[in-house]
Each structure stands twice: as structure tokens, then as C-alpha cells.
Amino acid sequence: MFSNSYLVYISETNLIHMTNEILAKSPSQGGILLTDHTKMVLNLGYSLAKNYPSYNDETLKELMVALILHDIGKCSKHYQDYMKKDVELDSEDLESPIKFNGPYHNSISWAFAIVCLNGVRPSIFKPYKHFPLLSSVLYHHTVKDDETLRAGDIITSIGEGDITVMKEFYMEMCKYVKDIFGIDILSSHDYTLVDEPSEIGYPLSDEKLFIDKKNCKTPGEYFNFTAISFIDRSILNYADRVVSSREYDNERILVNDVDYISSIHNDRLTRIPFKEDFSKYTDKKRLDIQIDTINKCFDNKEINTNVICASAGFGKTLMGLITYMKYQKKTLWVLPTLSLCESTYKSVIDELETLNASDQVSVGLFYSNEFKKGDVNSDIIIIGIDALLGRLSKNNLTPLLLDALNANVIFDEFHEFLMNEPLFAGFINLLKTRKDYTLANTFLLSATPLDFKNLWGNSHIKYWEDMPIYGGDIEVEIHYKEETTLDDMSFSFPENSITILPTVDAAQYAYINTPIETKLIHARYLPEDKKNHLDTVFNIYGKKSTVKYKTPIIGTNIIGTGFNISTRTINDYIITPMRTIQTIGRGSRFGEYSRVIYNVISSNMKADTGIRKLIESCACMSMRTQWVELLKDYDGKVITKNELYTIYNDFMKKYTKEWNMYISDCFKNSTDNLTKIRYVSGNYKKSDDDKLNRGYTYRGESTNFYATVPLDDGTYMDPIVCDINIRFKDDTDPKDRYYFMLSGLFNFPSKNELKYRWKIKKNYEATFDNCLGLARSKDCPLLLSNFNYKKDIGLYRRDL
């Protein structure tokens, strides 16, 4: 489209004319000019930025530069040549890749900022001075270029003429920003253009998605850069997608119709109040406390983050709905696991029915990168924490990214977010951003809440710690037992009991070897079977259960926290301070029993690595040991729930120093691991929807794969997601892994046998990694010949 040699000498007048012919989208996608597209993104972005009190003159100016630069790479000749072909992209996927020779436009835009602006390049003295700008520009799409490409190489590869056009485009947009918004970008030396681009050896791989805390001078600097980058990226991505989607009146956006633009994002958040009906709630005293607490939260305008320390059974679901009613604002309801998402969705639907409000409030359910119920416009969206944090690092469903920072958010059972993996740091950074940099309201619900004072103090946050213990007079009869192996299990499985075991294998072993009828629940089922088992648990032990004989339930920690179920007897193999309080909440949760039996089983962790790994992932080991010893002293005694909570609170006060140190260590490890998350993907295909993540995720290194097993009827099980540790221990001999892969060749369909044979090499580790990579696709499952599958047991070892 452009002659590079000619453009170097083209007159300024003609150059401006050329910038007005540059396309942002092909004709089939609307044929919008890049100048118009960028102006609309600027208009939307500026309107959004006014909702954040954290923006000052400098940070707002940097945001405007990012909005100008995000698509400037489309000025390149190879991109415009592609536009001329008018190749229609997948209309359902705005992330469809541009297939052409040369760097992708987001990489070019990023490189232009580093090479062609005077003060944006990162330095060893100020590595994150302009991190929000560079990160937002690069990651407004996934990075598809070779990560070894350097900024200088990218600019050199596209030609001097292209750079000239980009510079003119940049100057034109800077003038627009000054004329319309009164922001003089060029008054800051950092954002002025260099005379001649220099060779800069700064590679794409150095532009992390998340900041490395070690390069920040203070925790405050780390949180500030992280928060601004979150907000900048959300504004840029959302504004870009709104304009590109053509769902709104782009002509009104282009002329900067302020009222119309404001309505686009404000209407997403504002909700019409519904008429509640509390007549079916018989516990008026508890209801009054719930309503009064939320009213006090609403009236205190200086606090936007409230931690509700309510015991199990106190009605946190109803409190969440009262919050929605009071604030009349779109709400994200965030849970730690997929099972809890399903459970909470059911609880919210049930509560809305009790309130006679089912037809007034829409409820969505989102996890595994898709809506299972409702859609992005639902009034309340139940969402997993992984899926919510994924919006900070992925570019699909950008309205949810904006909601993550602007909607009301309820973090339910948030104590479960504490871990050494990136999820905890992601949660803390998001919470800190919402607390100090936005006007949005956040509610955190837990019977065993984390105390954040050690991380950032008490500003803008209130702990509601005087909530009465629900069912505090209910008696708890404690029994203590030590066991070395699963064969030592001495507690029976009486009617109306749940048994919580540390691993799936342990739960399956107990189920198989128990002579009486029991029900089993864990995570290793096919989706439909898992749903049926969860429904069974709720039908037997749920709030609306009419079942007289309650079949014993055997399961994993999937049922120990958050489930709205009630039982009379609990056999607990997972002993930590927090989990004891959480688990005892399943005992007489609905107040139907005056006494519950709590059987504490302390397993030999040296003999059972599964238990040790689980405990280490969620508790301070020294505190866990002391807690077990404390419970041992109550063997055979009867205390009330009130007394148990007092014991727990006194214990946590005694070990405050150790607990704060543990939280700090978790945060440090988590922030270190957060920098490992990078979304560098290849070309998107619809067939990729079921592919499992590679590399590092918010839960750590991804070792999941699809597996299948031969069934007794001669068929094969539908592919199921497994962790590689189901088959291998950490010290497994590489040769064993190799032969496993050979024996696991599975013609499903036939083309995949060729894939595996092509990948198999003499290098055992390479073979393992290659086959595991293939097995991340649902149509290439690995065969687990030593496993079987049954609907009641799930995927289990044949030698169990």
C-alpha cells in the first residue's frame, strides 16, 4: 500500500492524508479508519477513567498515551496490505489472528513506544516507570510473536516509511487529546518523539504480564504499579472491544457524546431494585442482624471493603442478596472452587425463591471459560476465582474484566485463596486495587477470615467480628483417634454422617471397602456424573431435604467448606485450625440437632504423603501440630460451638506472630510465582476451546491432561481431566514414563496414533513431554490401562 522509500520524502500535507486512509478493520469488519477507531477508544477510555479517583495528571496522561498507541502498529505496510485483501475474520471471535508476514500489531505498538518515545524505555534504575503503558499496549491482545524479538529489531523490520507514518499518526492523536480533553501529552519529555529510532535490545520476553516484586523499592510501589496496570489494561481492552464490536452507536461515540458514552458502562452496573419479601424467614433476630449489618456497611461511605466474619449457618448467602438489594448494583460472587460455584448458584436460586424474587433477578454461572447459566449481562454472576483472575490476563469477555474492578464483588470463603501459588497474589492485588484505587464495594465472607493488616494496614477496610455464632448452644462431642494407614480406619459410617478424607484414592478405598451403603463424592468424575453426585448430596443433606434415612457420605475436602449441608456426625481426617471451624459448620447447620459428633482422626503424615501435601498447601505446619495436640485434650469431652469458637480465637491470638509470618511467606512466594504466568498463544481455533492450559496457571504448573480407560463393556470412557501425579510420583524413573506413553497410545480417533508415533523419540523425557502436550487436547486422551471407571466410584485404580 505504501512505498517505504517514497514515504520518507512525502510532504507533511500528504502524510496526514495517508494517515486518514489507514484502516483499523477490513471492509468486511466495518472498514473503520484507524484515526476514527482510536478517537473512539480515547473518548470511551477518558470517560471510564473519570470513575477512578486514583488517576492524577501524570497517570491519566500515561493512560491516554496507551490508548493512542494500542493499534499504532496497524500503520505498518504488511498489515494494511492484509486489510486490502478484505479477508473476513471469524465474527464470533475478535481475537482471530491476522495471518501475514511480519510482527503482529500489538508487538509493533509496544516496540514503537520503547524505541520512538524519549523516556518510555525501561531501565535498570526505573524498570517499571512506564510498566502500565507498555503492559497494556502489548497485552491488549495475546502475544503471538517470537518472544526473543527485540524492540529495536521489530521497528527495523517494518521499515522507515512505516515509522514515519506512525509518528505522524501519534502526533495527530496527541493533538486530538489536547483539543478535546485539555491534556498536553507532549509537555512531558518522556512522551515526545525521538529524532532517530535507536537499536534497543529489549526483548518481548522481558515485558512481563505481572510486575516482579523484587524490582520494586517498597510494597507500596509494587501495589501502585500493579493497580494502575490493572486499571489501564481493563480500560484499554474494554474500550477497544466496545468499539470493535459495533454493538453500540459508534457515530455518537466518535463525536464524543458524553452522556451516551457514560451510559454504555454505567448501565452495565446499575440495577433496578426488586421488591423483597422476608415473610418466610422465621428467625427474625438473625434477619435483623443481617439487614442491620449491611445497612451499616452502606451508610459508611469512607469504607468500601467489608469483611463479614459470620459463622457457618448464619446466612451469608442471604446477606449477599441483601447487599445486592441495598446497593442496586451488578454483583460478582466469587468462589474458590467449581463445586462451590455450583453449590452457591443453587443456594442463591433457592434464596431468591424464598424472597419471591426469582423473576426479578437474573443469575449467571461462569467457570471453565464459559457461562453455564445466564450470560455476561446477568445481574449476579457466580464465578470461580481462577476465572475472575483470568480476566486480568486474557482478552476474551472483557466486560467481566471491567466488572472485576467496578461492579460490587463478594469474595465468599476467601480464606481458601491462601496458598503459595499465583492465585493468592492475584487475589490480594485485585482486592488492594479495588480497595484503594476504585469506588467499588467489596465484601469478604468467611467464618475464618484472613487478617490483611500485616499486608497493608487498616485503611478503607472494616472487620465485622461481633457477629453471633449461629447455633452457638449446640453441643459438640469430640473424639480423637490416631491412625497410621487407611486400614486402621476405626470410625464407622453411621446414618447421617459425612467422612472427609484427604485424597481421592483414600475416599475411594473407604467407599469400596465399607460393607454398608454409602455415597461417594470427589472431583474425579465425568462432569455429568459429578453433577449427579452433588445433587445426591444436596438432596440428602441440603436445607430442603425431606429424606428420613440419610445415607452416609464419604468424600474429600470438597464437602468440608462452603457446602450448604447439615449432618449429625463428622469424621474429619483433615485437621487444621481453620478447617476444623469450617467443617464443624456442617454439623447441625440448620439447627435440627442439639448435639453433633466430631471425630478427629490424626493420620501419620510420614506414612501418607497425600495428607502432608494437602496440609502444607493450606496451613502452617507448626500451628497444625499444636492444634492437633489441643484437640487431643478434648477427647471424650462435650463443649458447645460457642466454646469451640472461643478455643479457636484464643489459639489464633496465641499464634498471631506465626500466622502473620505464614501469610507473609505465602504472599512472597505467590508474588514470585505470579510473574511466571504468561499468555503467549498461537492461532486461535474453535477446536481449542477444550484444550487445557500449558505452562503456569494461577494454581501453579499445569500438569493436567485428558485421559481415558477401557470399560468393562469393551468401550472407552469419555475423556476426563486428570493430574499427571495420578500416574507418576515426582521421582518416577524417566524410562517408566516412556513405557507408560507407549502403552498409552490410543487410537481416538485414528489420526492421533500417527501423532503419537511421530512424537516418540529415544529421549524419554522429550517423549513424555510431547505426549503430555498432545493429551491436553480432548481428542487425544492418553489411555490409563491400570485404571477403571464406574459411575459410583469415578476414575479409580484397579489395584485399589
Task: Give each language-model segment a name.
Residues 301-323:
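Walker A/P-loop
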Residues 354-393:
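Inter-Walker segment of RecA-like/P-loop motor cores
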Residues 387-388, 397-432:
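SF2 helicase catalytic motif II
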Residues 330-341, 493-514:
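Conserved strand-helix element at the start of the C-terminal RecA-like helicase core
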Residues 526-556:
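Conserved helicase ATPase core of P-loop NTP-dependent helicases/translocases
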